Amino acid sequence: MTTQLEQAWELAKQRFAAVGIDVEEALRQLDRLPVSMHCWQGDDVSGFENPEGSLTGGIQATGNYPGKARNASELRADLEQAMRLIPGPKRLNLHAIYLESDTPVSRDQIKPEHFKNWVEWAKANQLGLDFNPSCFSHPLSADGFTLSHADDSIRQFWIDHCKASRRVSAYFGEQLGTPSVMNIWIPDGMKDITVDRLAPRQRLLAALDEVISEKLDPAHHIDAVESKLFGIGAESYTVGSNEFYMGYATSRQTALCLDAGHFHPTEVISDKISAAMLYVPQLLLHVSRPVRWDSDHVVLLDDETQAIASEIVRHDLFDRVHIGLDFFDASINRIAAWVIGTRNMKKALLRALLEPTTELRKLEAAGDYTARLALLEEQKSLPWQAVWEMYCQRHDTPVGSEWLESVRAYEKAILSQRG
């Protein structure tokens, strides 16, 4: 296999060199693009605060595949297993409900100490951490409102939760030497026709301003805000709409989060990246796969995933775009879900790096759209798979579908023993 891989690699280098692409440079650039894996795929967004509680906020994890992580130790072990099968740099994205404490902790009282184990684990595994306040699955979010709540005391609770979360995020960045991107998403909205659409947005605006009022070192912490079209139970009105957060991120110069599943099914976030970059300093991407709605299916190597990666690479947005994943499928092996989705994101980035973009730009500028289309299509047939397999080998990760054997062995030895 190694001989075949090396032969394919040498031939691929020649093929790409013929169109002006240095594959070694492409692999070096790929190592500059970490993908932030989301912890919540491992336990269906249960968390450790109240793991038997129901998931709320208009989101759903469907399926009942056996072996989900039941505590932090199991979740970290599962993550390590997945990460061993994914080449290149990675980060981990945590939600506040994944804190660890011997006694119950109110969400407005979370502290860095409740995430110390995650930081030590991240250090040991050379990972950066990202963070999210958890404004769902809680008695004070049960009526569908959090940061835009009309009740001052409830709204203040969620403001304090987000402020506490920012301090946790800054702790991550300080300890790990890489800024933590903290994304604020809230489920606030209404099921049916809404008469007053303005007041909740006014309250959300003021609440967010209070949340980000404490100045934190941008070398440690980055604020991001995330819109959504609708959620289950909030079909008619979402307070934090695209227009609201685009305006907020632009006026406050925070990062803007674009989630692939949070728009109308005919919209794609790949087309929004270049527009948003004109107005906001940084973007956070939640790469997902919506099937008819924000279903959070496992990411495929499909046209939209490729288009997202191509936008990042074509416009040299390496230092301004943070790539995160957001899906949770409980109907398949959860470790396999991580591996499939993350490897697909990295494959898309590699394919983008292997594109003869300079030549394509020249053709476009010259108005030769025939040649542009022809070259775009022909480059799809170039042997990028051989380059990917070499990348996997250099990072001591399985080539092709060999990783599935490792997942099956782990499932038999570990996952099958869980209740």
Curated annotation (Swiss-Prot):
GO terms for biological process: L-lyxose metabolic process; rhamnose catabolic process. It catalyses: L-rhamnopyranose = L-rhamnulose. Its EC number is 5.3.1.14. It is an enzyme of class 5 (isomerase). Mn(2+) binds at H262, D294, D296. GO terms for cellular component: cytoplasm. Keywords: Cytoplasm, Isomerase, Manganese, Metal-binding, Rhamnose metabolism. Gene3D superfamilies: Divalent-metal-dependent TIM barrel enzymes. Pfam families: RhaA. The keyword Transmembrane does not apply. Pathway: Carbohydrate degradation; L-rhamnose degradation; glycerone phosphate from L-rhamnose: step 1/3. InterPro entries: L-rhamnose_isomerase, Rhamnose_isomerase, Xyl_isomerase-like_sf. Its main location: cytoplasm. Binds 1 Mn(2+) ion per subunit. Its cofactor is Mn(2+). It is found in: Cytoplasm. GO terms for molecular function: L-rhamnose isomerase activity; manganese ion binding. Catalyzes the interconversion of L-rhamnose and L-rhamnulose. NCBIfam families: PRK01076.1 (NF002203), rhaA (TIGR01748). Belongs to the rhamnose isomerase family. Homotetramer. This is L-rhamnose isomerase. The lineage of its organism: Bacteria, Pseudomonadati, Pseudomonadota, Gammaproteobacteria, Enterobacterales.
